[in-house]
């Protein structure tokens, strides 16, 4: 078993998969500098966050929440694509596990398809992502080495590898959607199962193709997610009743996630993991509070039927498509405005409170600034998406 795990964690296995898909490292350009090994003359990669030199006067202390250590430097390796079908397929698949997908798919589901489904998806997604992000910084398993692996995503190089949160999120979204809709809508179950498997498989394979994870990282992420879905499934009906909880419920929804973010595992160097985790937990808290506000203040014009209720999937017409895109565009514009406004205000307040120079971008990485401003910003975004955007839709006459 130990030998099998070591083989699944081998970077050469990832490199062989990349070569099979037509992704190769570019030939060396000219002689090495002073005979140095490529790893010895590694360059700083754009997007790799490094520990700021100081936090405070005199530069004597590391940034709060960080140990003094240099971030890992990655060998900047050019690559050659010999099969553009796989290149574009896996680049698109990788995007299905990134922020751009979640900020489009989840709001679109809430505004145009079914708010109950979106709530289930978001809560399971938040749970899975938090556990995955924390596991990375607790286990501290490295990503595949480069060379031999070609790495296509530079922003995440500073993060650890095990488990793959892209694989976890894709598996959670796909199969939570399948399990929730099979008791609510009439459609061929086999078709839904195939779509869920294809979606999650493409995202998982994209993590190998982009060189960001080993096979063990991906399999570990899928297995952890499967276990979490099994363990949490009995509580899914309870999730549907959260909007009718007591008036103290929003306090718990704010305090618990903020506490988890503020006490996130200390990293050896700065990486975007803590900021991303804060964003995810804050968005989940905002969405949950938004549902509670809608129920408590009776802001929903007509209550939707709770799960499970068997319904026919309505046919897709031009009118429905235009209406859905219009509602989505209106909602995204409002969300972006709220995000920018709250972010600027929260940063100004925190900078003033901690007496930090406004132009000091490094200050955003400090624990006492990064966590509060991220949390306030994305909690506001979650509340806006579930409460104010639907109100704006009704005001504009968008059913």
UniProtKB/Swiss-Prot annotation:
Its primary localisation, in coarse terms, equals: endoplasmic reticulum
Q: Where in the cell is it found?
A: Endoplasmic reticulum membrane
* Segments of this protein annotated with the region Phosphatase sequence motif III: 206-217
Q: Which GO terms describe its biological process?
A: phospholipid dephosphorylation; regulation of type B pancreatic cell proliferation; sphingolipid catabolic process; sphingosine metabolic process
Query: Sorted alphabetically, which Pfam families does this protein's record hold?
Result: PAP2
Q: Where is this region: Phosphatase sequence motif I?
A: 136-144
DNA repair found in the keyword field: no
Gene3D superfamilies in UniProt: Phosphatidic acid phosphatase type 2/haloperoxidase
Name the UniProt record assigns to this protein: Sphingosine-1-phosphate phosphatase 2
Q: Which organism is it from?
A: Homo sapiens
């Amino acid at each position: 078993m130990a030998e099998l795990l070591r083989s699944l964690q081998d970077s050469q296995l990832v490199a062989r998969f990349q070569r099979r898909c037509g992704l190769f490292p570019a030939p060396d350009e000219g002689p090495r500098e002073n005979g140095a090994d490529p790893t010895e003359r590694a360059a700083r990669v754009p997007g790799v966050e490094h520990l700021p030199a100081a936090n405070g006067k005199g530069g004597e202390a590391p940034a709060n929440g960080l140990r003094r250590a240099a971030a890992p430097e990655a060998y900047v390796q050019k690559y050659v694509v010999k099969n553009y079908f796989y290149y574009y397929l896996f680049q698109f698949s990788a995007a299905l596990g990134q922020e751009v997908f979640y900020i489009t798919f989840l709001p679109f589901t809430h505004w145009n398809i079914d708010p109950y489904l979106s709530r289930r998806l978001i809560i399971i997604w938040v749970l899975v992502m938090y556990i995955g992000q924390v596991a990375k910084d607790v286990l501290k398993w490295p990503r595949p080495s480069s060379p031999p692996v070609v790495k296509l995503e530079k922003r995440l190089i500073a993060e650890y590898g095990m488990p793959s949160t892209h694989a976890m999120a894709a598996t959670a979204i796909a199969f939570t959607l399948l399990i929730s809709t099979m008791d609510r809508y009439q459609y061929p179950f086999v078709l839904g199962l195939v779509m869920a498997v294809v979606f999650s498989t493409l995202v998982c394979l994209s993590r190998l193709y982009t060189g960001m994870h080993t096979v063990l990282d991906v399999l570990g992420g899928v297995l952890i997610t499967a276990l979490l879905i099994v363990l949490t499934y009995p509580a899914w009906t309870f999730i549907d009743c959260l909007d009718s909880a007591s008036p103290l419920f929003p306090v718990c929804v704010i305090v618990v996630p903020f506490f988890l973010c503020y006490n996130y595992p200390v990293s050896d160097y700065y990486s975007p993991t803590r900021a991303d985790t804060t964003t995810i937990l804050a968005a989940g808290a905002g969405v949950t509070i938004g549902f509670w506000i809608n129920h408590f203040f009776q802001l929903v014009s007509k209550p939707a039927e709770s799960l499970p209720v068997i319904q026919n999937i309505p046919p897709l017409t031009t009118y429905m498509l235009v209406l859905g895109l219009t509602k989505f565009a209106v909602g995204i514009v409002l969300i972006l405005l709220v995000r920018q406004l709250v972010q600027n205000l929260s940063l100004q307040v925190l900078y003033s409170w901690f007496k930090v120079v406004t132009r000091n971008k490094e200050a955003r990485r400090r624990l006492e600034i990064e966590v509060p401003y991220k949390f306030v910003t994305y909690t506001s975004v979650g509340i806006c998406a579930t409460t104010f955007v639907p109100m704006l839709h009704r005001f504009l006459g968008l059913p």
